[in-house]
Swiss-Prot record:
Gene name of the encoded protein: CBR1
Major location (coarse): mitochondrion
Classification via Pfam families: FAD_binding_6 (PF00970), NAD_binding_1 (PF00175)
Identification of the protein by name: NADH-cytochrome b5 reductase 1
Membrane topology according to the record: Single-pass membrane protein
A cellular component term, taken from the record's GO annotations: mitochondrial outer membrane
Domain FAD-binding FR-type residues, every copy: 61-166
The keyword Thylakoid appears for this protein: no
């Protein structure tokens, strides 16, 4: 039998010893006081009992400061930024498919600048969130991030966005991503695979991804995507490059309707297409999907749209 000291501060089955002592002592003095003692003990110990539960920290209306914990260089202009949450057990509380806003005051700008990013981490990982960001010459927030030092903070607000993925919302999903447009796709892909029957879920959604980039070095997270495709026969990825290397077996040039027809599911009521990338690419993909029989994408995407643009 496990032994304990009445003066110990360790928890027993979620209740701290002083509370247990209060109940025991009350029961000895007068049994009818016992319910009140139990209630009081619950109040006294509540802070400890609930302190280890996961807490969602995002606020949709107010910016909060999060400290840069790590910075991993991916390429000459791409890095993964890891920001710490207030407590190790905290999670962002970001629905799958949604994104967050980052804000900063940039030198030379009269107003605070805001940009939206989708974390590549999920609420499965507590205590931090990761952002994959490419620094552009004219990108105010991306350049600001690139200049952040470990220990400095970034203002974050969210969640936001019309897309909220739920298991089996459609039978098939086709994805078209360009550059850092891969981030919301990866978030959804990983959620689907986590929810497979073999992992204790019921998600049987089939996913096909076309991922377009300029050069081989621009293919972000390729190793992770390849590993996911290897492990899950319900996920397939097809790479497209403007400047392919010798012996390249993927697509070449821009994403065309013929590529979409060959690599993504055909238009059907139980099929959805997700698009994310540079504005010119998104515009071209809207036209391409419409030409293949998908419903015309709206100016502002809604969750129920057959073609959804992030």
């Amino acid at each position: 039998m496990a032994m304990f000291s009445w003066t110990s501060s360790e928890a027993i089955n979620g209740m701290y010893i002083p509370s247990a002592l209060l109940i025991f002592g009350t029961a000895i003095v007068k049994k009818e006081w016992l319910p009140y003692a139990v209630a009081l003990a619950a109040i006294l110990s509540g802070g400890k009992v609930f302190s280890n539960r996961q807490r969602k920290v995002l606020n949709p209306t107010e910016f909060q400061n999060f400290e840069l914990k790590e910075k991993t260089i991916v390429s000459h202009n791409v890095a993964i930024y890891r920001f710490a949450l207030p407590r190790p057990t905290d999670i962002l509380g970001l629905p799958i498919g949604q994104h967050i806003s980052l804000a900063a005051t940039i030198e030379g700008q009269t107003k605070e600048i805001m940009r939206s990013y989708t974390p590549i981490s999920s609420d499965q990982e507590a205590g931090y969130f990761d952002l994959l960001v490419k620094a552009y010459p004219q990108g105010n927030i991306s350049k600001h991030l690139a200049g952040l030092r470990i220990g400095q903070t970034m203002k974050v607000r969210g969640p936001k966005g019309a897309m909220v993925y739920t298991p089996n919302m459609v039978k098939k999903i086709g994805m078209i991503a360009g550059g850092t447009g891969i981030t919301p796709m990866l978030q959804i892909i990983k959620a689907i695979i986590r929810g497979r029957p073999r992992n204790g879920g019921n998600d049987t959604t089939q996913v096909d991804l076309i991922f377009a980039n300029v050069n081989p070095d621009d293919i972000l997270l390729k190793d992770e995507l390849d590993q996911l495709a290897k492990e899950d026969d319900g996920f397939r990825v097809f790479y497209v490059l403007n400047n392919p290397p010798e012996g390249w077996e993927g697509g070449v040039g821009f994403v065309t309707p013929d590529m979409i027809r060959a690599k993504l599911p055909a238009a059907a009521p139980d099929t959805k297409v997700l698009i994310c990338g540079p504005p010119p690419m998104v515009s071209a993909m809207k036209k391409a999907t419409e030409s293949l029989g998908f419903k015309k994408a709206g100016l502002v995407s809604k969750l129920e749209d057959q073609v959804f643009c992030f």
